[in-house]
């Protein structure tokens, strides 16, 4: 065989193998939903879960950001950073689902839905935030932990309802992730509260 032809065939084969290998490693699965969107199969439970959990997560992010600015306790600051860091991407993910499903991002009737603990210890999110903004030091930390524990318990209740009633696999999977993560965070917060 001609040396030039052999080199050309070898180079072509190497290029083909490298191209196939790169395509296989790219992780671009055409069957996977793109841009964080869930498959379009969903029911009312999935829609309500996403709509209400977005609102619920926004409240947690708001409290966590306040704790990050107000608390002097490194463990509380670290926890607050992790809460905001986990929940903001979940808000974005659920917003993408609702858009994919052709559903409103905001729930039409907040009054008619179980907010799953949105009222923390008898206080609305606005009342909690207004109260917490007046606190500092150990008093702030204690109130933050108390309210965030109640908030997490509400999220777990909402997520468990989604696991039971939802049909969208990605939504029910996120709900299980929320149950697992927030159960662990409640245990962590209870430990921090006991140590105060």
Over which residues does each language-model region extend?
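C-terminal motif of bacterial Sec signal peptides marking the signal peptidase cleavage site
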Residues: 21-24
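All-alpha RGS (Regulator of G-protein Signaling) helical domain and cognate RGS-like helical scaffolds
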Residues: 27-196
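Hydrophobic helical h-region of N-terminal Sec-dependent signal peptides
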Residues: 14-18
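Bacterial N-terminal signal peptides that target proteins for export
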Residues: 2-13
């Amino acid at each position: 065989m001609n040396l030039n032809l052999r080199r050309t065939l070898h180079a072509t084969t190497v290029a083909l193998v490298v191209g196939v290998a790169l395509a296989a490693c790219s992780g671009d699965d055409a069957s996977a939903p793109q841009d964080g969107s869930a498959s379009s199969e969903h029911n009312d439970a999935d829609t309500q879960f996403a709509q209400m959990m977005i609102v619920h997560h926004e409240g947690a992010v708001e409290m966590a950001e306040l704790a990050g600015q107000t608390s002097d306790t490194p463990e509380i600051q670290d926890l607050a950073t992790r809460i905001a860091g986990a929940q903001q991407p979940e808000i974005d993910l659920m917003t993408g689902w609702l858009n994919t499903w052709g559903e409103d991002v905001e729930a039409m009737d907040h009054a008619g839905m179980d907010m799953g603990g949105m009222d923390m210890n008898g206080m609305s999110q606005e009342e909690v935030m207004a109260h917490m903004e007046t606190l500092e030091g150990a008093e702030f930390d204690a109130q933050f932990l108390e309210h965030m524990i109640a908030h997490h318990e509400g999220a777990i209740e909402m997520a468990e309802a989604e696991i039971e009633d939802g049909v969208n696999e990605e939504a029910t999977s996120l709900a299980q992730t929320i149950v697992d993560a927030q159960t662990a965070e409640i245990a962590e917060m209870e430990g921090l509260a006991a140590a105060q």
